C-alpha cells in the first residue's frame, strides 16, 4: 500500500512500522505508541551522548523516518553531553514514560531490535565511545553475541 505515492518515503514508513512492531513485540505489547516513545527516548539519549561524527555514522543506518526522529531537536554544538548511567536513566525514563527501575530492561530490548537492523560496526562504534557502565546499561552483557570485548572490559 502506498501512503505517500513516493516510493522511498513509503519504504521508510514500512521499515519504521516493522521496527516499531518488533520493539512492541519485545515488550509483549501491540502498543505502537509505546514502542515509538521508547524508541525515540533510546535514540535521543544515545544521540546526545555521542560525538557528531559517530552520531552521523549511526544515524545513516536508520530508516529515513527514524533518522528524522533521531535528529529532531538535536544541537550538534552541545554534544557529546557528559552524563553517566544515572542521568541516562533519568532522561530515558522521562522521555519513554517508564519508571527508572525499568530503564535497563527497556533500553536493552530496544538495543536488541536496533542491532538486528543496523550494521554491527555502526552500533558498536556508538557504544564503544561511551563509558563502559553506560554502554552496559544500553546493551547488557550477553546481549551482543559475537561482539568483541572492549579493552576496558579485559
Q: What residues fall within each predicted segment?
A:
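Amphipathic, non-membrane alpha-helical segments in soluble helical-bundle scaffolds
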Residues: 5-13, 32, 36, 52-56, ...
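Amphipathic alpha-helical interaction segments
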Residues: 37-41, 57-64, 87, 105, ...
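Short, solvent-exposed interaction modules
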Residues: 66-120
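Alpha-helical membrane-protein topology signature
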Residues: 4, 8-11, 27, 92-95, ...
